[in-house]
């Protein structure tokens, strides 16, 4: 244990003060553990997003987390709504609000919207300092389980391809694994090694999230057992040992009772925390106050340190679009 804690010689634990913008909550995937997707979808209007971003700026937020379901353009109703507003698709819509965000607020965009092609990633790189996609698990076996049997976008080959494409494009990237969706211990470890393999090739993975499944009412996996703190503890230690210099994050709103335990295990980031918006993926789990996180961290001798959505070592011309870099350096 001493060795794990010694790795974080700075004794800092970071977080990003963000605003969560759920651009659209329809998705082509129907995952067994998800409550974000809704057939009666809501597509946020441009003015609604601008209002949230403007307010977030007054709260001192520095990350704009743009999220929507995968391939929302497959939904004809979404497509029609976008067309009426003058947009060819969701990515053009996202690009415009991201560009507006950069020009009119102090927030920096970070997008997580499911599978994107190489060209789509390249397009969005112009207005995003970093991007993300959870690997969840590298095992194709899970595609035939209740977790992913109705989710074509959860094919690990597709997700690995996108993470690699982000590396080719030098996009600072956040990924992670999901614990407790029917995977074996070996599959968890293999997933971490797959992330390591990709990072060793491209060097772009800035953080890895070790996220625990949480049961929710009225989901197919409602009665599935949640992973124990011991299971999470093991995976955090292993992830830290395997991934070495990559930051390890555990969402604090999903782990209020065990967060300090996981800090001792080796995490060095609390992820995005918003003083304004809720976690729309886990709406039942409110964010802790930043002061609460500060106390959490201080009690174990760690200093809470705010960061941007892009990690400091990636804030260079090699990794960030010139316009965004100029904004960050101001």
UniProtKB/Swiss-Prot annotation:
Q: Which cysteines are joined by disulfide bonds?
A: none
Pathway(s) the chain acts in: Cofactor biosynthesis; coenzyme F0 biosynthesis
Its domain of life? Answer: Archaea
Residue stretches making up the Radical SAM core domain: 13-253
Under Enzyme Commission nomenclature, its number is 4.3.1.32
Q: Which reaction does it catalyse?
A: 5-amino-5-(4-hydroxybenzyl)-6-(D-ribitylimino)-5,6-dihydrouracil + S-adenosyl-L-methionine = 7,8-didemethyl-8-hydroxy-5-deazariboflavin + 5'-deoxyadenosine + L-methionine + NH4(+) + H(+)
Q: Does the keyword Hydrolase apply?
A: no
- Show the PROSITE patterns listed in the entry: RADICAL_SAM (PS51918)
Q: Which cofactor does it need?
A: [4Fe-4S] cluster
Q: Print the keywords alphabetically.
A: 4Fe-4S, Iron, Iron-sulfur, Lyase, Metal-binding, S-adenosyl-L-methionine
Which positions are annotated as binding [4Fe-4S] cluster? Answer: 27, 31, 34
Extract the InterPro entries matched here. Aldolase_TIM (IPR013785), CofG_family (IPR019939), Elp3/MiaA/NifB-like_rSAM (IPR006638), F420 (IPR034405), rSAM (IPR007197)
Gene Ontology molecular function, alphabetical: 4 iron, 4 sulfur cluster binding; 7,8-didemethyl-8-hydroxy-5-deazariboflavin synthase activity; iron ion binding; transferase activity, transferring alkyl or aryl (other than methyl) groups
What does the entry comment about cofactor binding? Binds 1 [4Fe-4S] cluster. The cluster is coordinated with 3 cysteines and an exchangeable S-adenosyl-L-methionine.
Task: Give the first-level EC class, as a single word.
Answer: lyase
Function in brief: Catalyzes the radical-mediated synthesis of 7,8-didemethyl-8-hydroxy-5-deazariboflavin from 5-amino-5-(4-hydroxybenzyl)-6-(D-ribitylimino)-5,6-dihydrouracil.
Family listed: Belongs to the radical SAM superfamily. CofG family.
Task: Quote the subunit structure annotation.
Answer: Consists of two subunits, CofG and CofH.
Q: Please identify the protein, giving its name as recorded.
A: 7,8-didemethyl-8-hydroxy-5-deazariboflavin synthase
Lineage of the organism: Archaea, Methanobacteriati, Methanobacteriota, Methanomada group, Methanococci
Q: Which gene encodes it?
A: cofG
């Amino acid at each position: 244990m001493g060795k794990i804690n010694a790795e974080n010689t700075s004794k800092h634990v970071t977080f990003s003060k963000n605003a969560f913008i759920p651009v659209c909550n329809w998705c082509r995937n129907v995952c067994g553990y998800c409550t974000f997707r809704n057939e009666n979808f809501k597509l946020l209007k441009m003015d609604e997003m601008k209002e949230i971003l403007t307010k977030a700026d007054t709260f001192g937020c520095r990350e704009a987390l743009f999220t929507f379901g995968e391939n929302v353009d497959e939904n004809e109703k979404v497509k029609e709504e976008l067309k009426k507003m003058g947009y060819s698709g969701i990515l053009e819509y996202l690009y415009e609000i991201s560009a507006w965000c950069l020009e009119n607020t102090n927030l920096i965009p970070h997008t997580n919207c499911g599978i994107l092609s190489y060209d789509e990633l390249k397009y969005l790189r112009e207005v995003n300092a970093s991007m993300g996609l959870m690997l969840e698990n590298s095992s194709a076996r899970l595609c035939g389980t209740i977790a992913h049997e109705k989710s074509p976008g959860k094919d690990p080959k597709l997700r690995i391809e996108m993470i690699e494409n982000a590396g080719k494009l030098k996009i600072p990237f956040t990924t992670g694994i999901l614990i407790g969706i029917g995977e074996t211990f070996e599959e968890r470890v293999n997933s971490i090694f797959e992330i390591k393999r990709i990072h060793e090739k491209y060097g772009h993975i800035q953080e890895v999230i070790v996220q625990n499944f949480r049961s929710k009412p009225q989901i197919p996996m409602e009665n599935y057992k949640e992973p124990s703190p011991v299971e999470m503890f093991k995976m955090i230690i292993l992830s830290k040992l395997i991934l070495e210099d990559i930051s390890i994050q555990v969402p604090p709103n999903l782990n209020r009772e065990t967060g300090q335990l996981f800090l001792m295990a080796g995490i060095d980031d609390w992820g995005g925390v918003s003083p304004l918006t809720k976690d729309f993926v886990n709406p039942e789990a409110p964010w802790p106050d930043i002061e609460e996180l500060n106390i959490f961290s201080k009690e174990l001798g760690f200093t809470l340190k705010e960061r941007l959505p892009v990690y400091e070592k990636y804030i260079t011309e090699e990794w960030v679009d010139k316009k965004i870099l100029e904004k960050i350096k101001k």
